[in-house]
Each structure stands twice: as structure tokens, then as C-alpha cells.
């Protein structure tokens, strides 16, 4: 399946994308044949070459939230991504965008999901998403999850990367981040 067993420390850094999510409710417009109103998903980004459809993890995150919690909803999810994290650099840029969408819809739809529940949803989309959920829960006080026992800036990741144990100490170090002009996908790195 392309996944490998690992043991590593994951640490948040200050580099981030800006992800804005807006929910606009529609009133009984565009119902399908079963009388159920659909939820549409639209993604925009400052990078014209980034996918805006189901190939994008932010889109996939909105789709999984709609599948699990969107029954009876009618409206549009608009996701605007301003990329700063280099793509194909091993920095979980797409994963963090997906995590941000899960958090946003949790708040916008008043679902009250905790970090564990969000991580369970996120792990079905990718191995880096649960850690991104944990880090965003700790860093973004507006989410109301910073006191959750799984909210953390640093974690020990085992298994395929989705088994996470928060580390309260974090890594205290300086970091120089460089990105060469090439990119390698996670699937290529772990594909062997």
C-alpha cells in the first residue's frame, strides 16, 4: 500500500499557508432527485498550477466532512488557499491545508468534534493530516481546542505516522529551511 512503519518526532514550524473557509447556506436550491440538497465545494488558490478539485487535500477534507456531517445541508463551501509552504518538499503543506478545512467546518457547522475525532477523519485522507490537526488545535486559540490533551506542537509519530503521542517539551532549536528547485512526492519517497 506504499506505507512504511516509522518512528519519528514531528514538530510544527512557523511557516504556514493561509486557508480561509467560508460556508454559505442555500435555501432549498438545487435539490437532487431524492429531494436532498447538495453541498458544493470550490477551491481557489494563489498558485494557478495547484489542483482545485478532488486531487487537492483541502477539497478532499471538505468532501469527507460533507459525507459524514453534511446530510440535510444545502450550500457552498469556499476554500481559498494562499500557499507559502513549498509543494513536494516534505513539509505537509497539502496535509495542513486539509487539516485547516476539517477544523473550519467543525467550527462553521457547530459539530463540537474533539481532536481525536478530527484526527480519525484526517487519517483517512493522509498520514500527515492528524499531526497537522493536533498542531493547529494547539496554535489556533479560536478553534477552542488548545486544551485538548492531543493538541500539541510536537509529537512522537509511530506506525504509518498516524499513531501520535504528544510531546510537551517540543524541540528547542534553530532551523534553516531551504528548498531546491525539484520536488518529490511522498508516494515516490516511500514507494521504494
Task: For each feature predicted by the language model, list its residue ranges.
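N-terminal hydrophobic or amphipathic segments with adjacent small-residue motifs
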Residues: 84-88, 104, 120, 153-155
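ATP-dependent small-molecule kinase catalytic core of the GHMP/sugar-kinase superfamily
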Residues: 2-9, 111-192
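DPxDG-like acidic metal-binding loop motif
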Residues: 58, 89-116, 127, 131-135
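Predominant activation on well-ordered alpha-helical scaffold segments within soluble catalytic domains
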Residues: 7, 59, 63, 99-102, ...
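ATP-binding N-lobe of GHMP and related small-molecule kinases
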Residues: 1-89, 107-112, 143, 170, ...
Amino acid at each position: 500500500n506504499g506505507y512504511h512503519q516509522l518512528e519519528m518526532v514531528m514538530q510544527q514550524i512557523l511557516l504556514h499557508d493561509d486557508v480561509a473557509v467560508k460556508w454559505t447556506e442555500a435555501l432549498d436550491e438545487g435539490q437532487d432527485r431524492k429531494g436532498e440538497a447538495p453541498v458544493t465545494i470550490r477551491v481557489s488558490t494563489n498558485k494557478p498550477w495547484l489542483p482545485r478539485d478532488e486531487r487537492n487535500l483541502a477539497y478532499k477534507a471538505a468532501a469527507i466532512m460533507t459525507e459524514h456531517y453534511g446530510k440535510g445541508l444545502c450550500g457552498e463551501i469556499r476554500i481559498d488557499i494562499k500557499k507559502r509552504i513549498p509543494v513536494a518538499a516534505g513539509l505537509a503543506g497539502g496535509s495542513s491545508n486539509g487539516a485547516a478545512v476539517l477544523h473550519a467546518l467543525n467550527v462553521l457547522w457547530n459539530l463540537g468534534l474533539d481532536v481525536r475525532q478530527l484526527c480519525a477523519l484526517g487519517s483517512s485522507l493522509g498520514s500527515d493530516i492528524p499531526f497537522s490537526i493536533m498542531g493547529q488545535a494547539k496554535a489556533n486559540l479560536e478553534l477552542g481546542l488548545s486544551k485538548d490533551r492531543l493538541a500539541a506542537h510536537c509529537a512522537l509519530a509511530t506506525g504509518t505516522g498516524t499513531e501520535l503521542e504528544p510531546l510537551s517539551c517540543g524541540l528547542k532549536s534553530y532551523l534553516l529551511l531551504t528548498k531546491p528547485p525539484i520536488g518529490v512526492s511522498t508516494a515516490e519517497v516511500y514507494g521504494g
